[in-house]
């Protein structure tokens, strides 16, 4: 049976390690720290098969060169971003296969960075810094419109998709979400569960897309309550869903 595990790294990053059904090989997603990956491979007696990168930020690529050199494995990453270690550049809409793991689907997710991509594999969405549990990434290189479109693209995936994001930001994300959407009972329950998990030293990820659609404000920009909250915050009418998104993102950036 295939599986994907989040490895805590750096300040609040997650490196995702996925193993094949035979339990002999694994691939790494966004390895910001090679030592964390090496320790996990040693503990589980697994061989590294590939590295997948979602975007160029150093906390997601810091360990790639060391892993690629030591293990001589392919490195997949966004074709439109400059990541020197990527030797298999890919873009959204492409599919590729890895022996023992089957097929991967690549999705374009511009917004956080201009060339950000995500990977869909066996019901797992490796979303990097595009979609978080309870939130989304800051808009650094793209536009709010691009980011909103990217998230809507991800929101159309099957509801049982496991969202494997790049950071442990869930409690802060859900605290903001609860501020913007205080009458959402499911959101309040999820926030408490996330607090309990962190207090116990447990990760809050992966989530499911169904959870995100019910509680993540950045996927719910057509919700009347969130529209009103965003309008109250900015002091003007918001006619389009992407305007609601942009306002929520600016609001979150100030908290």
Curated annotation (Swiss-Prot):
Zn(2+) 2 binds at residues 59-60, 129, 167. Keywords: Hydrolase, Metal-binding, Zinc. One of its GO terms (biological process) is methylglyoxal catabolic process to D-lactate via S-lactoyl-glutathione. It catalyses: an S-(2-hydroxyacyl)glutathione + H2O = a 2-hydroxy carboxylate + glutathione + H(+). Pfam families: HAGH_C, Lactamase_B. Its EC number is 3.1.2.6. GO terms for molecular function: hydroxyacylglutathione hydrolase activity; metal ion binding. Zn(2+) 1 binds at residues 55, 57, 112, 129. It is an enzyme of class 3 (hydrolase). Belongs to the metallo-beta-lactamase superfamily. Glyoxalase II family. Thiolesterase that catalyzes the hydrolysis of S-D-lactoyl-glutathione to form glutathione and D-lactic acid. Monomer. This is Hydroxyacylglutathione hydrolase. It comes from Halorhodospira halophila (strain DSM 244 / SL1). The gene is gloB.
């Amino acid at each position: 049976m295939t599986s994907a595990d989040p490895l805590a790294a750096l300040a609040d990053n997650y490196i995702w390690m996925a193993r094949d059904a035979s339990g002999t090989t694994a691939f790494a997603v966004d390895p910001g720290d090679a030592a964390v990956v090496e320790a996990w491979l040693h503990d589980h007696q697994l061989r590294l098969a590939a590295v997948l990168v979602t975007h160029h930020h150093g906390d997601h690529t810091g360990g790639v060169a060391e892993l690629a050199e030591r293990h001589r494995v392919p490195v997949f990453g966004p074709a439109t971003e400059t990541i020197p270690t990527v030797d298999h550049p890919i873009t959204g809409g492409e599919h590729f296969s890895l022996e023992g793991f089957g097929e991967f689907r690549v999705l374009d997710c511009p917004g956080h960075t201009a060339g950000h991509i995500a990977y869909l594999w066996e019901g797992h969405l490796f979303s990097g810094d595009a979609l978080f549990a309870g939130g989304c990434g800051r808009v650094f290189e793209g536009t709010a419109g691009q980011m909103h479109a990217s998230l809507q693209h991800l929101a159309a995936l099957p509801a049982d998709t496991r969202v494997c994001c790049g950071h442990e930001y869930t409690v802060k994300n859900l605290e903001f979400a609860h501020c913007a959407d205080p009458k959402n009972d499911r959101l309040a329950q999820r926030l408490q569960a996330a607090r309990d998990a962190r207090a116990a030293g447990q990760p809050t990820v992966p989530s499911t897309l169904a959870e995100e659609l019910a509680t993540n404000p950045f996927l719910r920009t057509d919700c009347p309550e969130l529209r009103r909250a965003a309008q109250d915050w900015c002091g003007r009418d918001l006619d389009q869903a992407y305007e609601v998104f942009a306002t929520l993102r600016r609001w979150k950036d100030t908290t």
